[in-house]
Regions:
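A residue-level detector for the "anchor" residue at the start of short, highly conserved motifs
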Residues: 67-74, 85-374
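Charged, low-complexity interaction regions
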Residues: 19-20
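Amphipathic alpha-helical interaction segments
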Residues: 23, 39-41, 80, 154, ...
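Regular secondary-structure segments
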Residues: 12-16
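Membrane-interface anchoring determinants
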Residues: 2-11, 25-29, 33-103
Length: 374
């Protein structure tokens, strides 16, 4: 029996608005599972496997070409809202080798104030360094924890900075002595002061991208510095993207309030807003914050973004080089939602299906060209 496209989309809209009844949710899941079973791709879990369902939605529901990508992205966003665990049941297209390139993982290097380098990838769990009044511990889940040493609470003897660096294909989380948490994205570095005792300035320096959950301390502002760009907060959740190869610096606010300063320019952000520093000017726009922090949640999430911008993020995470056979392809726009923890072929397949480009993987290089007419 042919699927009623409008009815399926009505169910998706209800999912997105959180108004779907349990019966309607079950109906949508049943619709998906029937098609998955037909192709012998049948998840065992009662909850729909997010990426498999996303691909099925994209293939099964046909809409006019001009709005197909946006509707597909909306459907994928719904699955993110539901919070379904990610599993992949995808069949790569002929142009993409499924055995090509694996995703990034928890990798980082800790550079101590004296220049000593400690590979957090290779170091055993437990205490890995002690400095003045600071103990540094590696946990078993990609997390580095700074704590004030016992009986040294409130002392301010430590000085200098440590640096945590993630390579391409790496990410790491840091917990500071004040309880603040920082997630560091691929190819980024974070410079941290050793002195986090009471009265000391809470100031870190970022190159690359990081998500911050800052502990609220009214008398001690927390400042994130990226070159001439600074974000000052008291306690809030926000994301800063400040890669050297990007044309701008973006600060996205999820909770609380932050003040963004660059030179003589300054703006205050409210939740749901993003500042953009480009060519010395700061602009502010309303955004879907899920896109800004999707990387931290384990997803790629792009909404009508330029292909060149998308591939910068892809290259950092998979540690690959990207070559455009035609510079005009850099301006192509795409929507894509997929897990970051799968081979690169999954993302490339999605983009091939939704656009007019094709990808060729040669070693650690991705070649992008125009799709050949059938």
């Amino acid at each position: 029996m042919p699927v009623d496209q409008e009815y399926i989309y009505s169910l998706l809209r209800k999912y997105k608005d959180r108004t779907a009844t349990e019966a309607e949710k079950e109906e949508l899941v049943s619709w998906y599972r029937q098609r998955a079973e037909r192709d012998s791709v049948f998840p065992e879990d009662e909850h729909v496997v997010a990426e498999s369902m996303r691909v099925r939605l994209h293939h099964e529901i046909t809409r006019p070409q001009h709005d197909r990508r946006r509707q597909w992205l909306a459907a994928a966003s719904i699955l993110l809202i539901i919070g379904v665990s990610v599993g992949l049941y995808l069949r790569p297209t002929a142009g993409v080798d499924p055995g090509d390139i694996t995703p990034g993982s928890h990798q980082a290097m800790l550079v101590l104030v004296d220049g000593t380098k400690i590979s957090l990838t290779e170091a055993a769990n437990g205490n890995i360094a002690s400095q003045e009044n600071i103990q540094i511990t590696k946990s078993g889940d990609g997390q580095l924890i700074y704590t004030l040493a016992p009986n040294r609470q409130g002392t301010a003897t430590a000085s200098g900075y440590n640096t945590i660096e993630t390579p391409k294909g790496g990410q790491y989380q840091v917990v500071l002595p004040d309880g603040s948490k920082i997630w560091l994205n691929a190819y980024s570095s974070l410079r941290l002061p050793l002195n986090f005792s009471e009265g000391a300035e809470r100031r870190v320096e970022l190159k690359g991208e990081a998500y911050f959950e800052v502990s609220h301390q009214p008398t001690r502002p927390f400042t994130v510095v990226s070159g001439q760009h600074a974000v000052q907060v008291l306690g809030t959740h926000f994301n800063v993207k400040a890669y050297a190869d990007e044309p701008d610096i973006k600060t996205s606010l999820l909770e609380g309030k932050v003040r963004v300063t660059a030179g003589t320019h300054s703006v205050t952000l409210a939740p749901g807003q993003q500042s953009r520093l480009a060519e010395g000017n700061i602009t502010v726009a309303e955004i879907d914050t899920r896109e800004a922090v999707a990387w931290k949640e384990g997803y790629f999430m792009f909404d009508d973004e330029r292909l060149e911008d998308i591939m910068r993020s892809v290259a950092r995470w998979y540690d690959v080089e990207v070559v455009f056979d035609n510079d005009a392809l850099k301006e192509e726009t795409f929507g894509a939602v997929t897990t970051r923890f799968t081979r690169i072929s999954t993302l490339l397949e999605i983009m091939e299906q939704t656009g007019d480009v094709q990808f060729r993987v040669e070693g650690k290089t991705i070649h992008i060209s125009s799709k050949q007419p059938v």
